[in-house]
C-alpha cells in the first residue's frame, strides 16, 4: 500500500539541562531543542505489506554535557504512525547511522534501530523514549533525567501503519 502523495514529517522536542558538577540542589536552566527529519518521508511497505518501519538519524547539536529532562515526539499525521521509539546512538554506531542516512531519508529498520546486528541493536542503541497515540511527553521528576553527551545523536524508529492510507 502507498500513501497517495502524502509526505510525512515529525518533530522531536527535547529539554536539556547542563549537567550539574557542583552538587547544587537548584534545578539548572533548561535549553529546548526542536529536531526534525532532514527530509519528509513517503511511507511505503514491502510487497504485500501494510507497515513501514523507518529509522532516521537526528542531531540536536548539543554543545555541552547535559541531562534530558523532557522529550516529546510529535507526528505530523498521527493516523499513519502506530508508534515511535527514540534510541541513543553510541559513538561506535554513529558512522553506520550517518552512512545509512546519507541522503536524509532514513533506512528500513524492523525490530530495532537497524544499527549493528539484529540482537546487538537492542544493547548498543538503548531506548530513551517512545510514543504511541494518546501518549504525551516524557517528563523527568525534579533532580532526575537521562545523561546526554555533547555531540550525541538520536535514532528514531517510526512504525507507519499504511492501512490508515485507505481510510
What are the residue ranges of the model-derived segments?
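Generic low-polarity alpha-helical segments
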Residues: 1, 21-24
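Bacterial N-terminal signal peptides that target proteins for export
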Residues: 1-7
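Bacterial N-terminal signal peptides
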Residues: 8-15
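Cleavable N-terminal signal peptides
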Residues: 10, 20-21
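Hydrophobic alpha-helical membrane context
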Residues: 16-17, 95
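Beta-strand-centric surfaces of beta-sandwich/beta-rich domains
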Residues: 23-167
Amino acid at each position: 500500500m502507498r500513501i497517495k502523495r502524502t509526505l510525512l514529517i515529525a518533530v522531536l522536542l527535547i529539554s536539556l539541562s547542563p549537567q550539574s558538577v557542583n552538587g547544587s540542589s537548584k534545578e539548572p536552566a533548561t535549553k529546548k531543542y526542536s529536531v526534525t527529519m532532514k527530509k519528509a518521508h513517503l511511507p511505503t511497505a514491502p510487497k504485500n505489506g501494510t507497515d513501514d518501519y523507518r529509522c532516521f538519524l537526528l542531531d540536536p547539536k548539543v554543545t555541552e554535557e547535559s541531562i534530558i529532562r523532557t522529550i516529546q515526539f510529535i507526528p505530523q499525521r498521527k493516523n499513519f504512525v502506530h508508534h515511535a521509539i527514540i534510541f541513543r546512538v553510541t559513538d561506535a554506531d554513529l558512522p553506520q547511522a550517518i552512512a545509512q542516512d546519507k541522503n536524509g531519508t532514513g533506512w528500513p529498520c524492523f525490530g530495532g534501530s537497524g544499527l549493528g546486528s539484529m540482537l546487538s541493536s537492542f544493547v548498543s542503541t538503548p531506548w530513551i523514549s517512545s510514543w504511541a497515540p494518546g501518549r504525551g511527553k516524557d517528563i523527568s521528576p525534579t533532580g532526575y533525567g537521562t545523561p546526554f553527551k555533547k555531540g550525541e545523536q538520536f535514532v528514531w524508529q517510526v512504525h507507519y501503519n499504511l492501512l490508515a492510507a485507505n481510510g
